[in-house]
Amino acid sequence: MPLLSRRCFFSSAGILFAPPLNPTLFSSDSPTNEKVAAVRPLPMSTIFKGEDRFHAIVKKASEENWRELPIGERIIKCARELHGLPYENFTLEIDDHIESPSVNLEGLDCWTFFEQAMGLARMISIEKEKYTPEDLLREIEFTRYRGGVCTGNYLERIHYLAEWFFENEARGTCRHLTPELTGAERIHDRRISEMTVLWKSYRYLKNNPELREPMAEWEARVAAMPVYHIPKAKVPALEPQLQNGDVIGIATKHHGGFCSHVGLAIRTDDGVTRFMHASRNYRKVVIDKSVSGYLNQFSSHAGILVGRPLEVSETV
């Protein structure tokens, strides 16, 4: 399983040493706040695919009253509606120049799988007479971009998974559990370079060379970040503490990034806490082995990072 590829193998890192977040952006429980919603510079046909599936999920959620479920259970309900969808590479590279929030419910990579399941779950927690694709795009914008806002700049997007954990904890959408879990260990001396080394694989970096130097500066911040993981050998003892809908980052032993993959924890009827993810190997979204069993399939896997999504009413 190669590391340095956007094929769902996302270098994970944080932005602790980045400029401070603007607290005025986080004064609402929901990205329906006007300060969060952005004008969409690209056509809806480019930024939103799978509208029929979107409406089918919304209809089912309404009929079965998913809104009353805890956020983790709601995420898994949404994730199950994505089960079996095809794996697709580079789903976020939708334009040569303009960055925009986007949704693709026809094909998913590992990042967009967990992100869209969480976005749908957050969206339906806010009671509305009718949901539109724009509602989901706002949720995606709120969690995908630094400060919860995209103005069209590629560098606004969170490109490394642990950055997502730290950014979203600051915003109150996800609790970053990893550092406080028993057995957590810091990953030291990690080179972060996936985006700049593989710039030819990314439409925006390939077509806008002026972005590469500032991307390298972000990677330098990322490399200095105190990122913790739960080592592989300690994960079996941790599995009973994992909850449905927890975001599970797969820590890697290789340089280039902190993580190589991401998915969701799901407890199945047999009582096993499994790893649900958009799989390159299976070419679709699958409910896989136990989290520890999945880790043990690959010698490059070092362990896991864990984030627990929070209810919309719990955001700051």
Give residue spans per PLM region.
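C-terminal soluble interaction/assembly domains
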Residues: G249-V306
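Sequence/structural signature of beta-propeller domains
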Residues: S62, W66, I71-G84, L92
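Acidic/His-rich structured neighborhood in mature extracellular/periplasmic domains
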Residues: E88-A220, H277
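Mixed-charge, Lys/Arg-rich low-complexity intrinsically disordered regions
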Residues: P214-P240
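Second-shell loop/turn segments in exported
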Residues: K60-E68, H97-G107, T252
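C-terminal segment of N-terminal export signals and the immediately downstream linker at the start
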Residues: P23-A56
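N-terminal export signals
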Residues: P2-L3, C8-D29
